[in-house]
């Protein structure tokens, strides 16, 4: 398998859909409602919409979009803290672009930037570390976001900053663990989920249990 081309093969996709329909017919379950499967990973949600997978599935399957975006489930108070950090003296606040428009109780980071805060969009914590190197007289605060899968890159960047004696680099860590999040959903008595489409990279971080 060449990894990319096979996953974008429409004929292969149709054959997989046909197999799913066969499996559904073999399931011994009530027909009162569709089989509800929740995808957890935001990458899965993006792929489902991009390739129209939801529309290809039979009516007996309903995809439930789960908490796949850590930015979307970020508490309002954390956004307020980020805005407060960004407004600090001599601070460069570095964040992923998708966090810019998330609204706090009063302001978003984008609004803070418009009001004069030095908020900059980066693609990785390494970019934020580069800002710290380039601005030794400023405090560079990286808005650490994501599930367990993003933590190693942030941790490695912190170690790199220590190795280089870059003492003006800081991390405002707001990482979320996925297992308690999913457990809270499954513990709800009215969730009606029949299955979960788990992200492989999270499984690598958390283990099979």
Model-derived features: where do they sit?
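Metallocofactor- and cofactor-centric catalytic cores in central/energy metabolism, strongly enriched
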Residues: 1-137, 151, 155, 159, ...
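Internal active-site segments that recognize and position negatively charged phosphoryl groups
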Residues: 141-143
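Glycine- and acidic-residue-rich phosphate-binding/metal-coordinating active-site segment common to enzymes
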Residues: 168
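Ligand/cofactor pocket segment of small-molecule handling proteins
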Residues: 172-178, 199-201
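A conserved active-site cap/scaffold subdomain adjacent to cofactor or substrate pockets
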Residues: 192-209
């Amino acid at each position: 398998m060449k990894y990319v081309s096979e996953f974008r093969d429409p004929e292969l996709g149709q054959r997989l859909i046909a197999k799913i329909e066969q499996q559904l017919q073999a399931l011994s379950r009530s027909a009162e409602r569709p089989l509800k499967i929740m995808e957890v990973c935001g990458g899965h949600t993006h792929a489902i919409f991009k390739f129209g997978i939801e529309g290809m599935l039979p009516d007996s399957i309903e995809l439930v979009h789960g908490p796949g975006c850590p930015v979307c489930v970020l508490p309002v108070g954390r956004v307020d803290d980020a805005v407060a950090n960004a407004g600090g003296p001599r601070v460069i606040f570095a964040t992923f672009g998708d966090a810019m428009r998330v609204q706090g109780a009063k302001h978003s980071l984008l609004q803070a930037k418009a009001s004069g805060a030095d908020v900059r969009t980066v693609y990785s914590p390494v970019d934020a570390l580069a800002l710290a190197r380039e601005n030794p007289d400023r405090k560079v605060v990286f808005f650490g976001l994501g599930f367990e899968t993003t933590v190693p890159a942030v941790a490695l960047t912190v170690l790199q900053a220590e190795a280089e004696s870059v003492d003006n680099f800081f991390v405002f860590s707001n990482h979320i663990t996925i297992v308690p999040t999913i457990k809270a959903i499954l513990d709800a008595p009215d969730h009606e989920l029949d299955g979960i489409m788990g992200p492989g990279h999270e499984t690598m971080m958390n283990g099979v249990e």
